[in-house]
Each structure stands twice: as C-alpha cells, then as structure tokens.
Amino acid sequence: MIHVRHTLAEVARVIVGLVFVGSGLLKAVDPVGTALKISQYLAPILSPASAGAETITLALSFVLCGSEFLLGAFLLMGVYRKFCARLSVLFMLVMTAVTLYTLIANPISDCGCFGDAIQLTHLESFLKNVVLLPLSILVLRDARALRHLYSRRERWVPAVLSVVGIIYFMAENYRHLPYIDFRPYAVGTNLREAIAKEEASLQRVLLGATKYIYSKDGKTKAFEASALPDSTWTFVEARQEADLASYKPRYDFNPIDSLGEPVISTLLDSEGITLLLLSPSWRTASQAVLDEISELHEEASRLGYPFYGVTASTSEEIAQWRYLTGASYPMLQLDATPIRTIIRSQPGLVVLRDGKIIDKRAYADFPSVEGVSTYLRSLPQMQPHGPSATRTYLLWAWAALQLLAFLRFWARKLHLTVHLHIKKRLHLTK
C-alpha cells in the first residue's frame, strides 16, 4: 500500500512539475505579453493608465513566470521537496480560485495559462486546475519520500543555475523580442495573403448565416444566397441566423491616415520594402534610439522605401513626438491593442516586403547609425530569421542539466542494485 502511494506521488510530481515548467516557460517567452494579461486581471483595481501600472504588472509577470518555472524544475529535480510541494499547493489553490472567478464573471477572453501558445477556454482552464490541485496535494503528502536527483550538498548548484537561467531568459525576451512568436504577426507571415484569406472566410460565414426572406402569393420563404428565387418573388428582408457579435478576427490590422482613410491596401499591396515604426503611445516610447530612427527614415527615403509611424497616440502626443525627434514621416493611427500584439517593444520596427513580414526589431536591436545603410540595403534579399543563439543555448543547457541529473540518478540506482546483488551472492556462497 505504501509502495502504491509513493508511486502515485512520483507520478503526480512529474505531471505537476512538467505542467509548471511548460506553463512558466511559455509565459517567460513573452514577459511583456504576460504583463498585459495580468493588467487585464487587475483592471478593476489597477487602471492600465495609472502611474506605475506598467512597471507593477511587468514585475508581477517576472515573478509569476519565474516562480512557476522554478517550482516545476525543483519538483522534477527533487530539490527542496517539502518547501516546493507546499508552494505548489498554495499556488494551485490561488490559481483554481482565479480560474473559477473567470469562469463565473468572464472578465477576460482567455486565462493566459500557457501564454499565447495554447489558449484554453475558461472551463478548460478551471478543469485543468481541478485536476492539478489534488495531484499537488498528493506530492505534498509524500514530499519527503520523493526521489531526488541531487543530494543535499549538491542541490544548491542546479537551484542557482535554474534561478539565474530563467531570470536571464526573461530579461532577454523583454529586452529583445519573444524567443518564439506565437502571435499572428510572426516573422515570415504573409499579411497580404493571411488577411485576404480571413476576409474570404468571414464572407463565407456571413453568406451561410444570412437568410433572404421572399414572399409570393401571400407566403414567405427563406432562401440562401446561392439559391435565390426568380423575379416572381418579392424580397422582404435579410436575416442573420448566426450570432457574429462574439466573432473576433485573428488579424485586427487596419490603420488609417490623418484623414481617416484606410491605408491597409497601400501597405500590403505595395511591391518592395515598407518600414513601419510602431508604438502604442509616443509619450511612453523610449527616446534612447532617436538618432537611429532619424537615420533609418532618411536612408529609407533615399532608397525609396516608404516609412510610416504607426501609433494610437493623440494628436497632441504626435505633435510632441515630432517636436522632440524632428520626425517628418507620415503617421498612421491604429488601436493600441493590435500594435502591442504586432510588436512588444516601444518603439519597434516591422519590415514588410511585398506584404510579408521579413523582420521585426525591438528598439534595443535597431541598427546603429553607422549600420543603417547596410541594414536597409540588405532587406530585398533578407530571409526570415529565428531568435538569437544565446537563448537557444540557454534552453539546451537547462535540458542538459536535467539529462545529467537523470543519468546520475539511474547510474547510482544501477550501482546500488549491482552492489546488493554481489553482496547477496557472497552471502549465499558463505
């Protein structure tokens, strides 16, 4: 019976640990996105426009992503077992309560449990926590009996490496752009084709959901768009038989110019290179790269590349930005939400080639003043590229740490088994 209980605890430890590691990593990939999700949760008590709100939510994002990953990692490695088991139960109690609240009140669209990688409904998120909570209690009940991959003397080494590693990983994803972009505007996306496909799909849904009511000889009948009656019938009305109010397009990219005219066709149908400098608000945009932005605009103009600023700022904020930076490029208006979805940096650069996103850069990665010309001249041949090698090496290093620990664990177990077998044989010989 005790053996079965310990086995269940071990299985529960692995499940809870893997979920925590996966959830923590998927959120740590995009700490700014996690901060935006936290701000939605805290909106009733902390207005996103209030002073310090962005700093508070970003700090909470780092704490949430880091603690969730570390809890899972420590559980998998079997270090600080009792402490981590208690924290995991506390964590699951809080998360279960939060997901129950979202299930009842529906304050946000999705829970954000796995970042933008996996979007669960409120019910799915709540059921996930209902399963994980008793599993974490199982782990707590037999915490001291759990197998460990590192001894008491050794455990501080993987613990410190894990803490330093996840902090560095999150900092890099914040300073640059997310390690993996799970959003609709990832590098390599052909916006021209993707938006056209979505619009065509919506039109099919609208046509299928619309019934056309005609009358003839005192009788009325509903027809579909593909099978309308002849001219002897009289049109009465069109009815929408499906509720499309909850429909949310995947692509919400429809900027307008200073006259209020849509310019999406101009941007996406243009052949060649188009540069977009985006920021939800010029008031909060970093001023650390003003010289680089000016050089980008001037060199782009010399090469004939269209260059636009895209923002949700007020006219006063735009005027202030022009005064501070000398910006003469045209400004386009777009809601702050799609801007934050497109790029997590303030400001950030998006490069389109024939309607396809070929590069995205946080302001920390803007080319230097001296390197602007080389960068812009490389764009016609540039191929979409992945994240920096540093973060890739970091993830491989952590995976290697786990593999080494498991190999050491099984080597010790094999050594002990062989030792006991030899001892038993010697005893029988005597």
Language-model-derived ranges and their functions:
Residues 84, 286-291, 390, 400-430:
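Juxtamembrane interface at the cytosolic side of transmembrane helices
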Residues 3, 7, 12-13, 19-20, ...:
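Hydrophobic alpha-helical segments
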Residues 73, 133-145, 401-417:
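Alpha-helical transmembrane segments
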Residues 168-264:
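Membrane-interface segments at or immediately adjacent to transmembrane helices
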Residues 150-178:
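Internal/C-terminal transmembrane anchor helices
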Residues 250-386:
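Soluble extramembrane regions of membrane proteins in the secretory/endomembrane system
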Residues 129, 151-153, 382-400:
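Juxtamembrane/start-of-transmembrane alpha-helix segments at the extracytoplasmic/lumenal side
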Residues 130-160:
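Cytosolic-side transmembrane helix boundary signature
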